[in-house]
A protein has these predicted regions:
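Hydrophobic adenine-recognition pocket in adenosine-nucleotide-binding enzymes
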Residues: 9, 139-144, 174
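Conserved acetyl-CoA pyrophosphate-binding loop and the N-cap/start of the following alpha-helix
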Residues: 144-145, 149-157
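C-terminal "cap" of GNAT-fold acetyltransferases
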Residues: 171, 175-224
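A short beta-loop-alpha structural element at the N-terminal edge
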Residues: 5-16, 43-44, 65-69
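Acetyl-CoA-dependent GNAT
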Residues: 22-32, 36-137, 195-198, 216-220
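Conserved GNAT acetyl-CoA-binding A-motif
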Residues: 134, 155, 162-174
Length: 224
């Protein structure tokens, strides 16, 4: 049976890493769209649009078409938000992983290999707002290789790296729609610290919430 190997990133991994990141982020579009539909303002717009057109046109078809168009526009808004984030990330740290993570102090980027194929990624670097912590970033595993313990192995790699360098904790940020990630982090001992809206206009419009988690390494060591 093939084994999982966690190793440091190499330049030849670049395209695979970008693909894993892009596909992983794109998976959250459907759940984010459903999150948007559950928001009271969205439901009010849909209801008012339907009722207003039904009353004014005396036709059932027109309001149905109008609501369909509003839903399509809402989904495109979600797609735009994720595509913008993906594009920004690919142009920033993921465009120069070696320079961003491997050549900087207390930073690193790892990939997970399964049967010689890169199927997962994770990284960490110092957090600007929490000097005593390293921040876990870019955690992603191919859909075809989930439920195999790869994500846990990647998270443990970051925790060990952080502990070895004398930092007190690992922090990370995930979104309210990433329920599987939340379950994983909480299972591994991370505690939810706070929730906050994405500061951009679209994030506020969608009521898209980010969650900050923290793993206290001293307590984690005692529990183990």
């Amino acid at each position: 049976m093939a084994s999982i190997q966690i190793r440091k990133y190499k330049d030849e991994d670049a395209e695979t890493v970008k693909e894993i990141f892009t596909l992983g982020m794109s998976e959250h579009v459907p759940s984010s769209f459903m999150h948007l539909l559950k928001q009271p303002p969205t439901q009010m717009v849909l209801m008012c649009t339907f009722c207003a057109l039904l009353t004014s046109s005396k036709s059932f078809l027109l309001p149905v078409l109008a609501v369909t168009l509003v839903l399509a526009a809402a989904r495109q808004l979600v797609v735009y938000m994720f595509n913008k984030y993906i594009d920004t990330s690919l142009k920033k740290d993921l465009d120069n992983i070696t320079g961003t993570y491997l050549e900087q102090k207390d930073s690193c980027f790892w990939v997970a290999e399964y049967d010689g194929r890169v199927v997962g990624t994770v990284a960490c670097l110092p957090n600007e707002n929490a000097p005593a912590c390293l921040e876990l970033k870019r955690a992603s595993v191919c859909r075809s290789h989930r439920r195999m313990g790869i994500a846990k192995a990647l998270c443990r790699t970051v925790a060990d790296f952080t502990r070895d360098r004398g930092y007190a904790a690992v922090i990370l940020y995930t979104s309210t729609v990433q329920t599987d990630a939340q379950k994983l982090y909480e299972h591994m001992g991370y505690e939810k610290i706070r929730e906050f809206l994405i500061p951009e206009f679209i994030g506020k419009l969608m009521n898209f919430t980010l969650i900050e988690y923290r793993l206290d390494l001293q307590r984690d060591t005692q529990n183990n």
